[in-house]
Swiss-Prot record:
Segments forming domain PpiC: 173-274, 285-385
Chief location category: periplasm
GO BP term (any one): protein stabilization
Signal peptide (residue range): 1-24
Biological function: Chaperone involved in the correct folding and assembly of outer membrane proteins. Recognizes specific patterns of aromatic residues and the orientation of their side chains, which are found more frequently in integral outer membrane proteins. May act in both early periplasmic and late outer membrane-associated steps of protein maturation.
Catalytic activity reported: [protein]-peptidylproline (omega=180) = [protein]-peptidylproline (omega=0)
InterPro entries: OMP_Chaperone_SurA, PPIase_dom_sf, PPIase_PpiC, PPIase_PpiC_CS, PPIase_SurA, SurA_N, Trigger_fact/SurA_dom_sf
Comment, domains: The PPIase activity resides only in the second parvulin domain. The N-terminal region and the C-terminal tail are necessary and sufficient for the chaperone activity of SurA. The PPIase activity is dispensable for SurA to function as a chaperone. The N-terminal region and the C-terminal tail are also required for porin recognition.
Organism of provenance: Baumannia cicadellinicola subsp. Homalodisca coagulata
An annotated Gene Ontology molecular function: peptide binding
Domain of life assignment: Bacteria
Identification of the protein by name: Chaperone SurA
Length: 433
């Protein structure tokens, strides 16, 4: 799931849509602005994104691009989106209603908002709930395509994981004595206010190199219009700090002055007075080695047909007529694991959903499961081995960090490769392929 979250963040960089602009003006005569293989991009699509970006820039007091520059930028993003959607179609990748509903539920729950309330708010604001769902489905679809295409391109060496895991362990087991200063900003600061606050932050950082007491600095440089806030954090664990501050303390040393750190409420400065490291023991966790065959449902294969097909495959494997590995390579629709005969490798048991965890624990080594359904389709699973290992939380965190870094890098490369392979014609624009 972390991989999907990261990919969604990459997608947002490419396909940001301000939802209140998601309904095109009526009565427009659409024109084709670009051809991408056998698909087209319409002027209305361009206008929706152009309006959304311009409105976002106005709301956030950002400089706006010239129309020609902005149009070129948007068309490029729409071309990339179209190419990835075409890849999804070729690979028969879809987003199930159950998965979409779950993600909307998770997103709304995190904001203490029910789906019914979200729907009501959106219907009262230009009736855009359906458009919101469609946009989210497209973002998830793109994430699935990127995840499938890029997974096998990423190589993470064991020594990379070990090195980063040690750094994470040290930081997680560290408590800090910190001074914290906040230069507050209004909810929608002007560019002038931002520049003045940043200049003050840099000045205070220089002053704090000479003077330890942030409180005195805050009193000295506060004005009637801008009161600086300062307080101490003594013996606070790294894991208990707000994420926006904690991530800036990796690599910090005693005496470090860290900043400017930007947040929604202003600019933060930290000074590290002391760092205390403690030792924490590891608790063993369960890992499983499994392989699977995945059959997706489609207009040509319903749920019952997929389940029956897997039951027949399981029967033939059990009597020795066919090999699990060979049949996985031939028919499994998990394009990543199918190349390895369905092999999923070693994974922490808690990385699986509760249904799959229960299923895996019920199997003996070498035993096949009954066909089981997920949001991806129907699975036939074979447990190959199970073991207890030392807690690899830090290694898992290190692996995820490395994965995310490399994923972001190669996503851009892969997208450019797909663009180079596609037939692209921009109408009334220079073709920048």
């Amino acid at each position: 799931m972390d991989g999907i979250k990261l990919l969604l963040s990459i997608i947002i960089l490419y396909f940001y849509t301000y939802i209140n602009c998601a309904i095109a003006e009526p009565n427009l005569i659409d024109q084709v602005v670009a051809i991408v293989n056998n698909d087209i991009i319409l002027e209305s699509e361009l206008k929706i994104l152009r309006d959304s970006i311009q409105n976002y820039a106005k709301l956030n007091y950002q400089e706006q691009l010239e129309d020609n520059q902005l149009n070129k930028h948007i068309i490029d993003r729409l071309i990339i989106k179209k190419i990835i959607q075409q890849q999804a179609k070729l690979s028969h990748i879809t987003i199930a209603e159950t998965k979409l509903n779950k993600i909307i539920h998770d997103l709304t729950s995190s904001q203490n908002l029910s789906i019914a309330k979200l729907r009501h708010l959106m219907y009262s604001n230009r009736n855009i709930y359906d458009i919101y769902r469609a946009q989210l489905r497209q973002d998830l679809l793109i994430a699935e395509v990127l995840n499938s295409a890029l997974h096998r391109r990423i190589t993470i060496l064991p020594q990379e994981v070990e090195f980063l895991a040690k750094k994470i362990a040290i930081r997680k087991n560290t408590t800090f004595n910190l001074s914290h200063m906040l230069i507050p900003l209004p909810e929608k600061p002007s560019r002038k206010q931002k520049n003045e606050a940043e200049a003050l932050a840099l000045f205070l950082m220089a002053q704090s190199e000479k003077q330890n007491d942030f409180r005195e600095l805050a009193i000295k440089y506060s004005t009637d219009t801008q009161m600086l806030n300062s307080f101490s954090m003594i013996g606070i664990q790294h894991t208990k700090l707000p994420l926006i501050l904690a991530k800036h303390l990796y690599g910090a040393q005693k005496g470090s002055v860290i900043g400017p750190i930007y947040s929604d409420i202003g600019i933060h400065i930290l000074k590290v007075h002391d760092m205390i490291r403690t030792h924490m023991s590891n608790i063993p966790i369960t890992e499983v080695y499994a392989r699977h065959i995945l059959l997706r449902t489609s207009v040509k294969r319903n749920d019952n047909q997929a389940r029956v097909q897997l039951l027949n495959i399981a029967r033939k494997i059990n009597i020795g007529d066919i090999s699990f590995s060979i049949v996985a390579k031939q028919i499994s629709e998990d394009i990543i694991s199918s190349q390895q005969g369905g092999d999923l490798g070693w994974n922490a048991l808690n990385a699986f959903t509760p249904t799959f965890r229960k299923l895996l624990l019920s199997l003996n080594k070498g035993q096949l499961s009954i066909p089981v359904r997920s949001s991806q389709g129907w699975h036939l699973i074979q447990l190959q081995n199970i073991r207890q290992v030392e807690n690899t939380t830090n290694k898992e965190a290190a692996y995820r960090i490395l994965w995310h870094r490399k994923l972001a890098e190669i996503a851009h490369i892969w997208i450019q490769e797909q663009r180079d392979l596609a037939y692209i014609k921009i109408i009334n624009h220079h073709d920048n392929r």
